[in-house]
Curated annotation (Swiss-Prot):
InterPro entries, per database record: Glycosyl_Trfase_fam3, Glycosyl_Trfase_fam3_N_dom, Glycosyl_Trfase_fam3_N_dom_sf, Nuc_phospho_transferase, PYNP-like_C_sf, PYNP_C, Pyrmidine_PPas_bac/euk, Pyrmidine_PPase_CS
Function according to Swiss-Prot or TrEMBL: The enzymes which catalyze the reversible phosphorolysis of pyrimidine nucleosides are involved in the degradation of these compounds and in their utilization as carbon and energy sources, or in the rescue of pyrimidine bases for nucleotide synthesis.
UniProt enzyme class: transferase
Sequence similarity: Belongs to the thymidine/pyrimidine-nucleoside phosphorylase family.
Originating species: Burkholderia mallei (strain ATCC 23344)
GO biological process, one term: thymidine metabolic process
Record GO terms (molecular function): 1,4-alpha-oligoglucan phosphorylase activity; thymidine phosphorylase activity
Catalytic activity: thymidine + phosphate = 2-deoxy-alpha-D-ribose 1-phosphate + thymine
Pathway membership, UniProt: Pyrimidine metabolism; dTMP biosynthesis via salvage pathway; dTMP from thymine: step 1/2
SUPFAM superfamilies: Nucleoside phosphorylase/phosphoribosyltransferase catalytic domain (SSF52418), Nucleoside phosphorylase/phosphoribosyltransferase N-terminal domain (SSF47648), Pyrimidine nucleoside phosphorylase C-terminal domain (SSF54680)
Subunit structure: Homodimer.
Name of this protein: Thymidine phosphorylase
């Protein structure tokens, strides 16, 4: 029988039972170009309003995985598991830059397919492109070599990996259907499965700087990713983490790379960044069979940080992908620096009781360090550093942050935006945990 995309879309629209074979045929049509952009848009909107049952989410994920190349690491003679992490994105979230090297130093192999920032969230690829010469789009053969030799490679999605997802996402982005939990789930997991990942630690953000607008929706997304990932044959766990303030005390591409280097070398390890990084990396080690339990995993992770093995893995990856061989030893020589810097003075004395993390991210976008739309050119040097945290006591005139900008005018605009993102009160706020819950 001839497959008609419009009949399949009608079933999704009407919440009729879906044949998993029809899901696969629809995705095959997307890849081949037989399904039009209008039909993709209609499908995405139908899913947005109705969502998909678990069986159809799994089928959609597997079909998107199979729309292109699927990396098979069995012939690469790796002596450890292939594991990965993924975050729904936030502000000051540089965990990928430290978790990948830590896990690689513990014996894991991490082919991390990452994305660019859009809106208020920072993108891992944008951070890495602040490193001169770093190639975020190597060939599949180069990706294999770097993962085998360095233990990790943090790169972008190639044209050969999950091409159907790329086409569907492009339509979602312009049809107000990005927020569909079913489509988010399939998009994330199809790329991870195409990369040949055996176990995935998922970081789902909650709070003012999170991608999902509510804690309930964040939890729903985490549950969906865990159920679909495991249903598709990839061991998956999700951690709900706090994004009511920047995760690290900085935001901006080159600034975050420097923060990651400081973390790996021990120059500075901010507590919130350390808590989330250790939680996710420990999950990767235990799911991959590299540690007996969370306590054993944390002991191993601490050891590779203190010995310098994790920093060495990061340096090896950077050099293998075209970056400076001495980046870890001399970051100030290679990373771009903004021309202007300005402190953000607190308007009054008191306790920091609320931070609008989304506003901080948008301040970086306003400086030129993020994208208002796809295709925007970035200034990798700009951003924020020394961000004050929730619950801190500040005096009037005390710096809440430092703005790094291309000129004095843009620094002044960002200074006002950052100051407005902080609410200072008379009483200290209730303390909140950075790791809210784990879903397995």
């Amino acid at each position: 029988m001839t497959f008609l995309p419009q009949e399949f879309i009608r079933k999704v629209r009407d919440r009729a039972p879906l044949d998993t074979a029809d899901v696969a045929r629809f995705v095959q049509g997307v890849t081949a170009g037989d399904v039009t952009e209008g039909q993709i848009a209609a499908f995405a909107m139908a899913v947005y309003f109705n969502e998909l049952p678990l069986s159809a989410r799994i089928a959609l994920t597997l079909a998107q995985r199979d729309s292109g190349d699927v990396l098979d690491w069995r012939g690469a003679r790796l002596n450890g598991p292939v594991v990965d992490k993924h975050s729904t994105g936030g502000v000051g979230d540089l965990t990928s830059l430290v978790i990948g090297p830590m896990v690689a130093a513990c014996g894991g192999y991490v082919p991390m397919i990452s994305g660019r920032g859009l809106g208020h969230t920072g993108g891992t690829l944008d951070k890495l492109e602040a490193i001169p010469g770093y190639d975020v789009a190597p060939s599949v053969d180069m990706l294999r070599r770097v993962v085998r030799d360095a233990g990790l490679a943090i790169v972008g999605q190639t044209a050969q990996l999950a091409p159907a997802d790329k086409r569907i996402y492009a339509v979602r982005d312009v049809t107000a259907t990005v927020e569909s939990i079913s489509l988010i789930t399939a998009s994330i997991l199809s790329k991870k499965l195409a990369a040949g990942v055996g176990a995935l630690a998922m970081d789902v953000k909650v709070g003012s700087g999170a991608f999902m607008p509510s804690a309930e929706q964040s939890a729903e997304l985490a549950r969906s990713i865990v159920d679909v990932g495991n249903g598709a044959g990839m061991r998956t766990a999700a951690t709900l983490t706090d994004m009511n303030q920047a995760l690290a005390p900085c935001a901006g591409n080159a600034i975050e790379v420097r923060c990651a280097i400081d973390f790996l070398t021990g120059a500075a390890r901010p507590a919130r960044l350390e808590a989330v990084s250790f939680a996710l990396a420990a999950q990767m080690l235990t799911m991959g069979g590299l540690a007996a339990d969370a306590h054993d995993a944390r002991r191993r992770l601490r050891a590779v940080l203190e010995s310098g093995a994790a920093a060495e893995r990061f340096a090896r990856m950077v050099a293998a992908l075209g970056g400076p061989a001495d980046l870890v030893e001399r970051p100030e020589r290679h990373l771009p620096r903004a021309a202007a810097a300005a402190p953000v003075a607190a308007a009054r004395a008191g306790w920091i009781e609320r931070i609008d993390a989304r506003a901080l991210g948008l301040a970086v976008v306003g400086l030129g360090g993020g994208r208002a739309k796809i295709g925007d050119t970035l200034d990798y040097s700009v951003g924020l550093s020394a961000l004050a945290e929730l619950g801190e006591r500040v005096e009037a005139g005390q710096p809440l942050a430092t703005v790094h900008a291309r000129d004095a005018d843009s620094a002044a605009q960002a200074t006002d935006a950052v100051r407005r993102a902080y609410r200072i009160g008379a009483e200290p706020p209730a303390q909140t945990r950075v790791v809210h819950a784990v879903i397995e």
